[in-house]
């Protein structure tokens, strides 16, 4: 745990005790703060109280007594409308911050020179975060991995000289971290997502920009127009910018040519490494993730050899284009993390004959943007609330069935793929949807897919 000493002896309000919220409360108490915590969920309040955290309904609190208000990232700060606790904090003039901001202040106070890499973007954050941490660890660095990837940042070991931090940041966390100042900050890409919480695409982009604007070195993917403009703006403001691209050559930066990653500097380009044969980094999207990891690791002093060794030994992440089983020439791929169309595109681009399981709780725009990949899809198996709208989009372009459930979709897709005599094929869960209509989260959905695949006759599991 990182004891938060910045508010020692002062009173701090905290709202949101699920997920990282309880860990944040404990870190504040450990650092000597007088914490008053609350949540709209009585079970979360009871759990915090049982853990020794002082709880009280903040509606009745004297807000002028608080030095800060710590808000969990899952609680609305601005859209669709501010949570009632946010309104009370504003009325009292109390600063509103989150757990990443508390981490940033502790690092600055106790070990400002320890390298800190922060990663954001609409898609690819977790893979890039895990890849960077893997490279650092295999190169022998003391590495702490946390943030939005699943480990609350304040549960990590405390900052000290020589310790590296790799932190995935959601837009919600950045919005609550006004002094975010990583050694290297990464913005991978920007596509419409979470607009229910940010109102407009421009507001969403403005929040993401803060992470790289405060960085020592800003690593920015320039394959979308908003991110490209951000790179230009941040560079004009005086920050060192390393541009990355999976789509086109760059005069300066790191870019992909097929599976080859090129490094352009001082007017010349040279091969940095080739990802061919690294199954866990298959596809153009992973070329971008690897390019970002290379740029960030170079920025914090890791050698080219150590970076390449780390890339080659990367084990990959669950639920992200994860090959989980084989049966003959059919591979079963768990890409449950693809919760929107943009995130599903990389998997669809990486295989040639696909039996596609898709659907769930639909996101804005549906799957119309995936039309270029429809020729690769032998048949689609549609599940969840999105099934009728996805069927309408597929129309006559792709054969489909409305399977309804994941179990039925897996069984039917596997049977159809087994009869495919035209070469290697993939039965792929890449839903292009959120999971919440049928599953608690994408992890549970992915695990269910793996379970249904494992129950099939004659499959060889790869995990």
Swiss-Prot record:
Enzyme Commission code: 6.3.2.9
Location, primary (coarse class): cytoplasm
UniProt-annotated location(s): Cytoplasm
Reactions catalysed according to its record: UDP-N-acetyl-alpha-D-muramoyl-L-alanine + D-glutamate + ATP = UDP-N-acetyl-alpha-D-muramoyl-L-alanyl-D-glutamate + ADP + phosphate + H(+)
InterPro entries given in the database record: Folylpolyglutamate_synth_CS (IPR018109), Mur-like_cat_sf (IPR036565), Mur_ligase_C (IPR004101), Mur_ligase_C_dom_sf (IPR036615), Mur_ligase_cen (IPR013221), MurD (IPR005762)
Superkingdom in the source lineage: Bacteria
CC annotations in GO: cytoplasm
GO molecular function, one term: UDP-N-acetylmuramoylalanine-D-glutamate ligase activity
Keywords: ATP-binding, Cell cycle, Cell division, Cell shape, Cell wall biogenesis/degradation, Cytoplasm, Ligase, Nucleotide-binding, Peptidoglycan synthesis
Name of one Pfam family that matches: Mur_ligase_M
Positions bound to ATP: 121-127
Enzyme class: ligase
GO biological process: cell division; cell wall organization; peptidoglycan biosynthetic process; regulation of cell shape
The protein's annotated pathway: Cell wall biogenesis; peptidoglycan biosynthesis
SUPFAM superfamilies per record: MurCD N-terminal domain, MurD-like peptide ligases, catalytic domain, MurD-like peptide ligases, peptide-binding domain
Function: Cell wall formation. Catalyzes the addition of glutamate to the nucleotide precursor UDP-N-acetylmuramoyl-L-alanine (UMA).
HAMAP family documented for this protein: MurD
Protein family membership: Belongs to the MurCDEF family.
Listed NCBIfam families: murD (TIGR01087)
Protein name: UDP-N-acetylmuramoylalanine--D-glutamate ligase
Record organism: Rhizobium meliloti (strain 1021) (Ensifer meliloti)
């Amino acid at each position: 745990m990182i004891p938060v000493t910045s508010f020692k002896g002062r009173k701090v309000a905290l709202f949101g005790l699920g997920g990282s919220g309880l860990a944040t409360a404990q870190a504040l108490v450990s650092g000597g703060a007088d914490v008053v915590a609350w949540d709209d969920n009585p079970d979360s309040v009871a759990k915090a109280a049982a853990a020794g955290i002082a709880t009280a309904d903040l509606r009745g609190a004297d807000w002028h007594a608080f030095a800060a208000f710590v808000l969990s990232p899952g609680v609305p700060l601005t859209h669709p409308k501010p949570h009632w606790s946010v309104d009370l904090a504003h009325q009292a003039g109390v600063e509103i911050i989150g757990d990443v901001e508390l981490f940033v202040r502790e690092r600055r106070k106790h070990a400002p020179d320890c390298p800190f890499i922060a990663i954001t973007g609409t898609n690819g954050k977790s893979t890039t975060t895990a890849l960077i941490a893997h490279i650092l660890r295999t190169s022998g660095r003391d590495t702490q991995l946390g943030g939005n990837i699943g480990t609350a940042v304040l549960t990590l070991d405390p900052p000290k000289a020589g310790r590296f931090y790799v932190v995935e940041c959601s837009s919600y966390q950045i919005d609550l971290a006004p002094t975010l100042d990583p050694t290297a900050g990464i913005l991978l890409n920007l596509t419409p997502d979470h607009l229910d919480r940010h109102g407009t695409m421009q507001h969403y982009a403005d929040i993401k920009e803060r992470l790289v604007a405060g960085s020592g070195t800003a690593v920015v993917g320039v394959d979308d127009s908003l991110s490209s403009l951000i790179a230009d703006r941040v560079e004009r403001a005086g920050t060192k910018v390393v541009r990355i691209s999976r789509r086109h050559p760059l005069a300066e930066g790191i870019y992909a040519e097929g599976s080859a990653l090129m490094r352009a500097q001082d007017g010349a380009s040279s091969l940095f490494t080739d990802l061919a044969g690294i199954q866990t980094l298959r596809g153009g999207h992973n070329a971008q993730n690897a390019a970002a990891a290379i740029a960030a690791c170079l920025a914090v002093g890791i050698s080219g050899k150590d970076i390449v060794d780390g890339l080659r030994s990367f084990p990959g992440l669950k639920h992200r284009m994860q090959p989980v089983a084989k049966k003959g020439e059919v591979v079963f791929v768990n890409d449950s993390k693809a919760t929107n169309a943009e995130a599903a595109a990389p998997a669809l681009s990486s295989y040639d004959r696909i039996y596609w399981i898709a659907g769930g709780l639909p996101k804005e725009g549906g799957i119309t943007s995936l039309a270029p990949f429809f020729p690769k899809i032998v048949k689609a198996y549609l599940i969840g609330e999105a099934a009728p709208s996805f069927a309408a989009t597929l129309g006559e372009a792709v054969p489909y069935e409305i399977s309804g459930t994941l179990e039925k979709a897996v069984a039917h897709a596997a049977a159809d793929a087994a009869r495919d005599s035209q070469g290697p094929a993939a039965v792929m869960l890449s839903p292009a949807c959120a999971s919440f209509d049928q599953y608690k989260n994408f992890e549970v959905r992915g695990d269910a897919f793996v379970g249904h695949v494992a129950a099939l006759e004659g499959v060889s599991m790869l995990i």
